[in-house]
């Protein structure tokens, strides 16, 4: 893993020239803004006075990389006007307040679009802008629970597994917000008309299950976890423990890959067939017994260079040092902080790391000058 130099002037990224106002929050909003910033957008984060939303040193808040920060008190008489001054010069805005809060602060969609009719106003919430739960507090675990996605993950005989806040906040939230923002930006450039993008984690998390709803309707998926082909129910698509407590992920779905896997893992000829569903428990037990005979490192060597579709389950730090990811530069290190590099990859306009995580208010004077908003300048 190589260190990253903060330099993107010669390769500003595919979103160079796009200005984004991010009203500071936590979770999916900042991550969405980071995605845009990594791709070259000029993201200005509007922080409020006082302690930040995360109780960590700003230098470690990786989701604020490639951004600049201004300090604005939206509850002060001049605060809303300062933000609207930025809005006039922006193409995108991201906010993650509960429904109605931005309006009460004077920076809701109506106020912003009145100042900039071509603005794309992105709203990131868990429950959405309407519906019976819209005003309720919540977090990723609750949103994915209600959307039907959390219940798909885990052992059939235990509680659902919790995939950090990756499935809801970031996959069902941030990524859908970014898709919505960029689609609406395209429309605004074609028509001159902005609009509001209502991105809800429950909607995105539900949308991720589209294929499975088709399988459910076709009778090829059971509406309970841990018994299906892709949720750990199939012995050929599961995680097994090695003799030293390490784990291996097996994804040998196709018959030709399963044949190679069976040979390398040492399954006996009389083992149940790959898709002999009634005998899946027996097959799983046999595979588990084989994996229990060697360490993780030994099994990794056995499967290295094969098409058996078996990989070691790595921790975050282990993943950052894996030779394949190191060769691709999947992870990088900036100022001593290991972090994922921008993704995806672009052949002509690659994403870059141009600035360290923004410190609240540190760029107020610079942004006031660059964006032409003198009302922001510190007095």
Set out the residue ranges of the language-model regions:
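Flexible glycine/proline-enriched surface loops and loop-helix/loop-strand junctions
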Residues: 159-169, 241-246, 349-352
């Amino acid at each position: 893993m190589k260190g990253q130099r903060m330099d993107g002037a010669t390769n500003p990224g595919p979103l160079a020239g796009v200005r984004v106002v991010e009203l500071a929050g936590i979770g999916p909003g900042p991550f969405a803004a980071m995605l845009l910033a990594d791709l070259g957008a000029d993201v200005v984060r509007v922080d409020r006075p006082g302690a930040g939303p995360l109780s960590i040193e700003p230098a470690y808040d990786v989701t604020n990389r490639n951004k600049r920060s201004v300090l604005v008190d939206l509850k002060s008489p001049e605060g809303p006007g300062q933000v609207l001054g930025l809005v006039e010069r922006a193409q995108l805005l991201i906010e993650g307040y509960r429904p109605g809060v931005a309006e009460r602060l004077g920076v809701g969609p109506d106020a912003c679009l009145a100042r900039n009719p071509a603005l794309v106003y992105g709203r990131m919430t868990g429950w959405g802008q309407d519906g019976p739960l819209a005003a309720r507090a919540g977090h990723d675990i609750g949103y994915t629970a209600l959307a039907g996605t959390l219940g798909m993950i885990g052992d059939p005989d235990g509680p659902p597994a919790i995939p950090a806040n990756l499935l809801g906040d970031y996959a069902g939230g941030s990524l859908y917000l970014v898709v919505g923002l960029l689609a609406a930006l395209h429309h605004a450039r074609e028509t001159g008309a902005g609009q509001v993008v209502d991105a809800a984690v429950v909607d995105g998390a539900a949308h991720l299950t589209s294929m499975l709803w088709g399988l459910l309707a076709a009778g090829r998926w059971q509406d309970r976890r841990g018994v299906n082909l892709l949720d750990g129910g199939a012995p050929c698509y599961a995680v097994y423990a090695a003799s030293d407590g390490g784990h291996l992920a097996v994804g040998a779905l196709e018959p030709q890959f399963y044949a190679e896997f069976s040979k390398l893992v040492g399954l006996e000829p009389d083992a149940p067939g790959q898709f002999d569903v009634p005998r899946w428990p027996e097959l799983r037990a046999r595979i588990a017994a084989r994996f229990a005979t060697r360490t993780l490192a030994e099994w990794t060597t056995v499967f290295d260079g094969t098409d058996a579709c078996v990989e070691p389950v790595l921790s975050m730090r282990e993943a950052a040092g894996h030779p394949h990811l190191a060769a691709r530069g999947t992870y990088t290190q900036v100022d001593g902080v290991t972090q994922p590099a921008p993704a995806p990859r672009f052949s002509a306009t690659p994403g870059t790391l141009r600035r360290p995580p923004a410190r609240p208010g540190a760029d107020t004077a610079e942004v006031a000058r660059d964006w032409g908003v003198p009302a922001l300048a510190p007095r």
